């Protein structure tokens, strides 16, 4: 007789579908909310990932995908989505001056005002737990007084003409300063229906909107009479001449527009960007190659030494040599920054005492680059040493015994047996190390911050900058504003370069070993 296993309440289909339905409603609400806020990419990403997840976990036929989905979702969320966003930004003028939408930039301009009409001296007088606002016309000497009010939010105060000011003690400057934000939200309406607002800590003035918006989108400056029209090529309201051509004046803030491949064109045509870009690209490749070669060479030699049978105290040497790998890299980098200090660093003190020289590690381009490679070799060799120590165990001792019978020495054994047998399994890891060092932002940012700086460039660039740190400086340290669009274009080029170099390296090594 078959035994029917009773399900617990938390295993019931009704509960499962109820939870899935609630999650679906929640996701739908979030997607609509993102769409309404204009976050279209986030809305699409949330819709795709959540829909796929609900389908996989609700359908028994996709049971095997439940183990793969978290990894795929993580890759999509943290790798593919940022990549798509970066590429999308690269085709816009998104920057510190062009962050807003057209509607928001237009509203900011329409909210601006200028001082027009009379200026009145004002005072605050206590009225129990509330206050009264008093205005005095400096030309006629007339006084105007409001009813009692409390601070908080936007409000209009109707003022009436009065013969004398209240007899209480007038609020001092400290009280006015403390309530300045609340006073800025007050509009005082005079008996003739004219309106004045706070213009300084002691005065209220009449104001008018600085710009008037026409039905055709034309913006007119009410002070100067200059007319502006939105220029969707540059993302600014730009002045227009009498003949309808564009003038030189642009109104800030601008708005974000799609500009096509202009950012990519700037990289290759603007000499202020082109020269440092290609120079930095060459240095980035050289830095990555030298780092891989030196870390592998040092790590392999040290691995062979600590595996030497005749060496005593091998365990102690292994621990000491692995220490640079155990210490967090950012701590080691900052320590080396102090050691290489040109005036007080221990390295220059030793070089001065022994050889009478004090290299300019941070101001000379060549010595700065040498310092970067030295520090990165120190940080990277323990990883390669650990890999080589494991791979050396796989080399049969018979090969070394046979070479000893032929009279081969240690150097011949290393170059004829050890090196060829280690290089093949190390190749994929060397390619990964090359890709990592191609984007080694932390080292450059903490050690040299890209310096020494290059002269004659339109973007901030230094002699030790890698492409990734150069991109960061364009995005966040630009003197003329943070140019996120240009930085995204360079980041896209870096992605394509690293991908192309990795493919070329993999194909080259495959052809070599086949």
Curated annotation (Swiss-Prot):
Keyword Transmembrane helix annotated: yes
Cellular location(s): Cell inner membrane
Job description of the protein: Part of the ABC transporter complex MalEFGK involved in maltose/maltodextrin import. Probably responsible for the translocation of the substrate across the membrane.
Residue intervals on the Cytoplasmic side: 1-16, 58-69, 307-318, 393-412, 507-514
Name of a matching Pfam family: MalF_N_TM
Topology Periplasmic: residue spans: 37-39, 93-283, 342-369, 436-483
Protein name, per record: Maltose/maltodextrin transport system permease protein MalF
Disulfide bond positions: none
PROSITE patterns documented for this protein: ABC_TM1 (PS50928)
BP-aspect Gene Ontology terms: maltodextrin transmembrane transport
Residues spanning the membrane: 17-36, 40-57, 70-92, 284-306, 319-341, 370-392, 413-435, 484-506
InterPro entries for the chain: MalF_N, MalF_N_TM, MalF_P2, MalF_P2_sf, MetI-like, MetI-like_sf
Top-rank lineage group of the source organism: Bacteria
Alphabetical keyword list: Cell inner membrane, Cell membrane, Membrane, Sugar transport, Transmembrane, Transmembrane helix, Transport
Membrane topology of the entry: Multi-pass membrane protein
Gene name of this polypeptide: malF
Keyword Calcium recorded: no
Subunit structure: The complex is composed of two ATP-binding proteins (MalK), two transmembrane proteins (MalG and MalF) and a solute-binding protein (MalE).
Domain ABC transmembrane type-1: 281-505
Assigned protein family: Belongs to the binding-protein-dependent transport system permease family. MalFG subfamily.
UniProt GO molecular function: ABC-type maltose transporter activity
One Gene Ontology CC term in the entry: maltose transport complex
SUPFAM superfamilies: MalF N-terminal region-like, MetI-like
């Amino acid at each position: 007789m078959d035994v029917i296993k009773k399900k617990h309440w938390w295993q019931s289909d009704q509960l499962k579908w109820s939870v899935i339905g609630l999650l679906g409603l929640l996701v739908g609400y979030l997607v609509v909310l993102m769409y309404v806020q204009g976050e279209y990419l986030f809305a699409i990403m949330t819709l795709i990932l959540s829909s796929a997840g609900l389908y996989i976990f609700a359908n028994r036929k996709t049971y095997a995908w439940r183990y793969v989905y978290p990894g795929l979702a993580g890759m999509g969320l943290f790798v593919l989505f940022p990549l798509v966003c970066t590429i999308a930004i690269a085709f816009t003028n998104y920057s510190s001056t062009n962050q807003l939408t057209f509607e928001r930039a237009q509203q900011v301009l329409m909210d601006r005002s200028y001082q027009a009409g009379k200026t009145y001296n004002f005072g605050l007088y206590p009225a129990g737990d509330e206050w009264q606002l008093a205005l005095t016309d400096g030309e006629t000497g007339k006084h105007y007084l409001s009813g009692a009010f409390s601070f908080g939010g936007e409000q209009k105060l109707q003022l009436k003409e009065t013969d004398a000011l209240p007899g209480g003690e007038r609020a001092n400057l400290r009280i006015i300063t403390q309530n300045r934000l609340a006073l800025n939200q007050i509009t005082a309406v005079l008996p003739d229906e004219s309106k004045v607002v706070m213009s300084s800590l002691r005065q209220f003035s009449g104001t008018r909107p600085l710009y008037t918006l026409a039905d055709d989108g034309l913006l007119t400056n009410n002070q100067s009479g200059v007319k502006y029209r939105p220029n969707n090529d540059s993302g600014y309201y730009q002045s227009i001449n009498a003949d309808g051509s564009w003038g030189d004046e642009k109104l800030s803030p601008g708005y974000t527009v799609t500009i096509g491949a202009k950012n990519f064109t700037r990289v290759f045509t603007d000499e202020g960007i082109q020269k440092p870009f290609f120079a930095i690209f060459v240095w980035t490749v050289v830095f990555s190659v030298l780092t891989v070669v030196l870390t592998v060479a040092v790590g392999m030699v040290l691995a062979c030494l600590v595996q030497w049978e005749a060496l005593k105290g091998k365990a102690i040497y292994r621990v000491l040599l692995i220490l640079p790998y155990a210490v967090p890299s950012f701590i080691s980098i900052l320590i080396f920054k102090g050691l290489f200090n040109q005036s007080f660093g221990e390295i220059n003190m030793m070089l001065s005492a022994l050889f009478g020289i004090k290299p300019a590690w941070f101001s000379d381009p060549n010595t700065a680059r040498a310092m970067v490679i030295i520090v990165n070799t120190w940080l990277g060799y323990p990883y390669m040493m650990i890999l080589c120590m494991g791979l050396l165990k796989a080399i049969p001792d018979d090969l070394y015994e046979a070479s000893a019978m032929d009279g081969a020495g240690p150097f011949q054994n290393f170059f004829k047996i050890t090196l060829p047998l280690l290089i093949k399994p190390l190749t994929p890891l060397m390619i990964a190390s090359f890709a990592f060092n191609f984007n080694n932002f932390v080292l450059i940012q903490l050690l040299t911050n890209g310096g020494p700086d290059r002269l004659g460039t339109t973007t901030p660039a230094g002699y030790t900058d890698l492409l990734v740190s150069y991109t960061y400086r364009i995005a966040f340290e630009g003197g003329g504003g943070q140019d996120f669009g240009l930085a995204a274009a360079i980041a896209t080029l870096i992605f394509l370069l690293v991908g192309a170099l990795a493919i070329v390296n993999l194909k080259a090594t495959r052809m070599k070993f086949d």
